[in-house]
């Protein structure tokens, strides 16, 4: 299977540069995975497609304002760090730009010295391991000084940091938002619960590997980045009861899907579990837990379009994406959504 099999022509003007004023006013393409039939709706209409007893699985990760712009303590030279993951305590793995300035032992300051970073070592792929020094609580300092790490295809400045968070975000640790969840409002979630639909939560901290292009020709040769996940006992039991009752487990986003499929066993059950996953889902994969999926429109030739093709069928997805381009749907993080039913 070739990576080029997942290519489609995408005009740049269809890449959404900002979120819509109202989260659930985005468009919703409903794709029937069995027939390939397409309906065009608004996201709020998702309510009509959810049944009593179904369980919606949401990723409650919260995006860290992980982009820090500072200067070299000695010379005042500019530096930009993008935090990737906490290693332990105040040590973090990050990307440094320009990397040549971030030599081992160099000290950088942010926010007029409120935060300092010392480069401790150079890791894999040139990533830096840095250690922070600060007064107070790190998360509060980062909230004050950090900027949202918006994807590389978004060029507009984000006016409101919260628009790159889901309304149910809770567990800090992501370098990018689980964007399928951005369409939900508090009111819509209440309506969903009132209809008798269960809501389960898990955590997967989204890494920057999400935006890395696939650099091989053959899909089988691609190696996924790994990301931390957690599913607690209460939510695992809710998902298992749903499967036992013959109801649907509907994943919100590829991150929720990958977590559920990592934990799921051959009998279609999940359990409380934490760890790191590098699961790569592409056509040919048989889903164990996920029945349906709410997702955004993804980049051509990305691992995410491969995942949705595994669930809905490659021909159905490529046809749906070409239809989305023709109908001028908005693409990527701040774009419109798809429900694979």
From Swiss-Prot:
Output the InterPro entries linked to this UniProt entry: QueA, QueA_dom1, QueA_dom2, QueA_sf
Q: What is its pathway?
A: tRNA modification; tRNA-queuosine biosynthesis
Substrates-to-products reaction catalysed: 7-aminomethyl-7-carbaguanosine(34) in tRNA + S-adenosyl-L-methionine = epoxyqueuosine(34) in tRNA + adenine + L-methionine + 2 H(+)
Which UniProt keywords are given for this protein, alphabetically ordered?
A: Cytoplasm, Queuosine biosynthesis, S-adenosyl-L-methionine, Transferase
EC identifiers of the protein: 2.4.99.17
- Molecular function GO labels: S-adenosylmethionine:tRNA ribosyltransferase-isomerase activity
Please list the GO biological process terms of this entry.
queuosine biosynthetic process; tRNA wobble guanine modification
Quote the subcellular location field of this record. Cytoplasm
Q: Which PANTHER family match?
A: S-ADENOSYLMETHIONINE:TRNA RIBOSYLTRANSFERASE-ISOMERASE
Chain's role: Transfers and isomerizes the ribose moiety from AdoMet to the 7-aminomethyl group of 7-deazaguanine (preQ1-tRNA) to give epoxyqueuosine (oQ-tRNA).
Assembly behavior:
Monomer.
Q: Which family does it belong to?
A: Belongs to the QueA family.
Q: What is this protein called?
A: S-adenosylmethionine:tRNA ribosyltransferase-isomerase
Give the organism the record lists: Clostridium perfringens (strain 13 / Type A)
């Amino acid at each position: 299977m070739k990576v080029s099999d997942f290519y489609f022509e995408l005009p740049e003007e269809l890449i959404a540069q900002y979120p819509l004023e109202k989260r659930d006013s985005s468009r919703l393409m409903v794709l029937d995975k069995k027939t390939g039939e397409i309906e065009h709706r608004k996201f709020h209409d998702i309510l009509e497609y959810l049944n009593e007893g179904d369980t919606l699985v949401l990723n409650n990760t919260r995006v860290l304002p992980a982009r820090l712009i500072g200067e070299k303590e000695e010379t005042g030279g500019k530096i930009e760090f993008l935090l990737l993951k906490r290693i332990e305590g105040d040590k973090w793995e990050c990307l440094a730009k320009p990397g040549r300035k971030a030599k081992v032992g160099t000290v950088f300051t942010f926010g007029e010295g409120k935060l300092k970073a010392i480069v401790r070592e150079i890791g894999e792929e040139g990533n830096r391991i840095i250690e922070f020094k600060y007064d107070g609580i790190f998360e509060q300092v980062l909230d004050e000084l950090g900027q949202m790490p918006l994807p590389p295809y978004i060029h507009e400045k984000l006016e409101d940091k919260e628009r790159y968070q889901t309304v149910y975000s809770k567990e800090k640790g992501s370098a990018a938002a689980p964007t399928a969840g951005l369409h939900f409002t508090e009111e819509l979630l209440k309506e969903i619960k009132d209809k008798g639909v269960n809501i389960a939560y898990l955590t997967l901290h989204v890494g920057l590997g999400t935006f890395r292009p696939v650099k091989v020709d053959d899909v089988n040769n691609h190696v996924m980045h790994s990301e931390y996940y957690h599913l607690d006992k209460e939510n695992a039991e809710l998902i298992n009861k749903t499967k036992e009752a013959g109801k649907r487990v509907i994943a919100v986003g590829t991150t929720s899907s990958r977590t559920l499929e990592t934990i799921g066993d051959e009998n279609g059950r999940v359990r409380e579990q934490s760890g790191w996953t590098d699961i790569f889902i592409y056509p040919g994969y048989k889903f164990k837990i996920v029945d349906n999926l709410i997702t955004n429109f993804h980049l051509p030739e990305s691992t995410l379009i491969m995942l949705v093709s595994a669930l809905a069928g490659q021909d159905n997805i490529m046809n749906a994406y070409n239809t989305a381009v023709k109908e001028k749907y908005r693409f990527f993080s701040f774009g419109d959504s798809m429900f694979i039913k």
